[in-house]
């Protein structure tokens, strides 16, 4: 297959721990050809969704801590997305309007015969924090609103809540509001921009001290290990970007129940790769843009997550 990755600039990637790089390694090892494009390389001309792209190969045995781990194998070119055997969307958030426009282009490309993973429409229709509201039985009590009075009432009823923006990533903008929080109003005014920006409030889950878990679903099947992201002492955010420590562990029975309950439904919508964030017994986020943790799970357990992805992509692309 000729696989196109829509991705951030390669020199900016931390290749030694980047899941997209791990995917590329697995695909190249299985004999597939790789190309890369940036989000800004996508365009429509005369109704056809096209892209500028660069064909690349990963260097065998390269030091992934440096910048010399890949090479261009030909001149940059342009082509319709439908010409590739598979298009893998791996552009990191933020999920801003440019990202939304990109999902539209990917959706149009699919209508023209392109095989895109994850599907453009599916990415757009599953905002990572809002998507959990489809599964209320699997989540902690959750409120989505910009009404500060409603949030205060929710806080009073629950006693201990987490509030966060809907478009944040890496743990940014997340606050824990305990019952006696003296800065409640100031925090809500800031997060909601004085009632003009919708946010999410969730009942605090004490098990966060043991870490939140990233459970990966690939082709409708759960990876048998999660990555528990243990917060720093005094932190309520387990995100690796916020200083959390990643520890791989086998899925529990509850983890498997959560994963299997949502896996088929999400896979059937064109979501080849999904990352569930789980705290205790509850799903807290459904990540569909650029799920990670491939490398950490593989290195700590020996289970080859990138290989599982490559096999699933081959099957899905037909």
UniProtKB/Swiss-Prot annotation:
Pathway linked to the protein: Sulfur metabolism; glutathione biosynthesis; glutathione from L-cysteine and L-glutamate: step 2/2
Substrates-to-products reaction catalysed: gamma-L-glutamyl-L-cysteine + glycine + ATP = glutathione + ADP + phosphate + H(+)
InterPro entries: ATP-grasp (IPR011761), ATP_grasp_subdomain_1 (IPR013815), Glut_synth_pro (IPR006284), GSHS_ATP-bd (IPR004218), GSHS_N (IPR004215), PreATP-grasp_dom_sf (IPR016185)
The keyword Manganese belongs to this UniProt entry's keyword annotation: yes
Requisite cofactors: Mg(2+); Mn(2+)
UniProt keyword annotations, A-Z: ATP-binding, Glutathione biosynthesis, Ligase, Magnesium, Manganese, Metal-binding, Nucleotide-binding
A Pfam family hit: GSH-S_ATP
Note accompanying the cofactor annotation: Binds 1 Mg(2+) or Mn(2+) ion per subunit.
Tagged with keyword Nucleotide-binding: yes
Enzyme class: ligase
GO molecular function: ATP binding; glutathione synthase activity; metal ion binding
Residues where Mg(2+) binds: 285, 287
GO cellular component: cytoplasm
EC number: 6.3.2.3
HAMAP family: GSH_S
Name of this chain's protein: Glutathione synthetase
Native organism: Bordetella parapertussis (strain 12822 / ATCC BAA-587 / NCTC 13253)
Gene coding for it: gshB
């Amino acid at each position: 297959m000729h696989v196109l990755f829509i991705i951030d600039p390669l020199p900016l990637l931390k290749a030694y721990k980047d899941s997209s790089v791990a995917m590329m390694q697995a695909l190249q090892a299985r004999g597939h050809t790789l190309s890369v494009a940036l989000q800004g390389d996508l365009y429509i001309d005369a109704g056809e969704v096209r892209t500028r792209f660069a064909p690349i190969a990963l260097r065998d045995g390269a030091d992934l801590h440096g910048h010399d781990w890949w090479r261009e194998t030909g001149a940059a070119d342009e082509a319709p997305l439908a010409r590739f055997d598979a298009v893998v969307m791996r552009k990191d958030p933020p999920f801003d309007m440019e990202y939304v426009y990109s999902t539209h282009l990917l959706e149009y490309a699919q209508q023209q015969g392109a095989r895109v993973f994850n599907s453009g429409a599916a990415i757009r229709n599953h905002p990572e924090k809002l998507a959990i509201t489809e599964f209320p039985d699997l989540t902690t009590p959750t409120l989505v609103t910009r009404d500060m009075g409603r949030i205060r009432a929710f806080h009073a009823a629950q006693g201990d809540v987490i509030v966060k923006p809907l478009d944040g990533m890496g743990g940014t903008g997340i606050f824990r509001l305990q019952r006696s929080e003296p800065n409640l109003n100031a925090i809500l005014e800031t997060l909601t921009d004085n009632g003009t920006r919708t946010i999410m409030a969730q009942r605090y889950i004490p098990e966060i001290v043991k870490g939140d878990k990233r459970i990966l679903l690939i082709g409708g099947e759960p990876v048998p290990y999660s990555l528990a992201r243990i917060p720093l002492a005094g932190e309520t955010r387990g995100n690796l970007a916020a200083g959390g420590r990643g520890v791989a562990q086998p899925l529990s029975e509850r983890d498997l129940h959560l994963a299997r309950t949502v896996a088929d439904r999400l896979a059937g919508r064109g979501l080849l790769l999904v990352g569930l964030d789980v705290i205790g017994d509850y799903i807290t986020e459904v990540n569909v843009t650029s799920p990670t943790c491939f490398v950490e799970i593989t290195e700590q357990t020996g289970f080859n997550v990138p290989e599982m992805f490559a096999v699933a992509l081959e099957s899905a692309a037909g």
